[in-house]
Amino acid sequence: MNAIELKNVYFSYDGKVRILENVNIALPYGKVNLVSGHSGEGKSTLLYIISGIIPNITDGEITGEVLINGEDIKGKKLGEVCREVGVVLQNADEQIIQKTVEDEIAFGCENLAFSPEKISKQIDIVCKLMKLERSWQCRKLSGGQKQRLITASTLAMGQKIVILDEPLANLDTTGAGMLMSTLRSLAKAGYCIVVIEHRLDVVLPFVDNVFHVSDRKVTEIIDKERYFKDQSTEIADACLEFSGTSNMFSLTNVAFSVKERDILKDVTFDILKGSRVVLLGENGCGKTTLLRLISRLEKPTRGTISQNIDDKFGQKSRQSKKWYQKVGVVYQNPDYQLFMPTVEKEIKFGAKSNEYADKIAAQFGVKHL
């Protein structure tokens, strides 16, 4: 018997535009299943359908059969589905509500009326599995530790089907590899693991099945290596379009310290106009700090950062303008930057003109939202 099975599933949010069409997939126990595809194609929607969030919390028109352990979940309440399907969402901060690791893990177990003895045992098991300590303060955890905590909290409740929505988003390479290795071990122990993820280079060595979501369809990928090569080539080809020779930013001997602790030291490099730059490094090494320095949200303790920005559409920046008007910052959590009630109002809120806002919306494929 499969853990999850979708038969002839169609879904739309408004009854008109279909998000998913004729989905037929089967996910067995004992396997790590990857759901991949471009943003906006319907991966998270698929998660919401399997977990019962659709239609219990999020409205929409759904047809077909969604089977969990061979039983159609149509008409079941969310609480009934959640007893069989655990969900780990992307943003750990939105899921952590307790002060300590112990209390956070215990919270879900208490809601399921576990005995105190069973709760204590579950905490011991998942803390050991996820390399956490009972007494740790949640607010002091790193991004990677928070991700492990919300995964541990889900596992402690005992569901054998676990879905993780982009669990590697806040993890460095080491942390991502460790989490995927743990998920691989859980699958070998009989769990059904479903991972929605973009970081194919990290996840593919750990997964058994790959499902690609595109153009409303969900397709099982047979050749994982070929799939990774095709996706990587697509990214590389896009990067070839960009080149530059003159400097946009110049950093010279830049250092940044907090309470006499060096976060960055003697950073010197140039960023060219028209270029794409990727900052790589382990969690806590200073990547975000460096971005905050470049965007002038922080000022360096030592050294200089100079800029020479020409607007892409021909309006030359003046030195009299404030730095924040020249450098845009997109945060990791979009909830920190969304304020307006509709997509159109959000895009036009700070735009230099409505026409330019419409152009950008079309380029990013969100004009119809």
Please tell me what each predicted stretch does.
Residues 137-141, 145:
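Conserved ABC ATPase signature
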Residues 162-166:
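Catalytic Walker B motif of ABC-type/P-loop ATPase nucleotide-binding domains
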Residues 36-38, 280-282:
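The feature captures the beta-strand-to-loop junction immediately N-terminal to the Walker
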Residues 51, 295:
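Helix-to-loop junction immediately C-terminal to a conserved catalytic motif
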Residues 65-80, 304-322:
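ABC ATPase NBD Q-loop/coupling interface
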Residues 117-134, 355-369:
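Conserved ABC ATPase "signature" region
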Residues 197-198:
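H-loop/switch region of ABC-family ATPase nucleotide-binding domains
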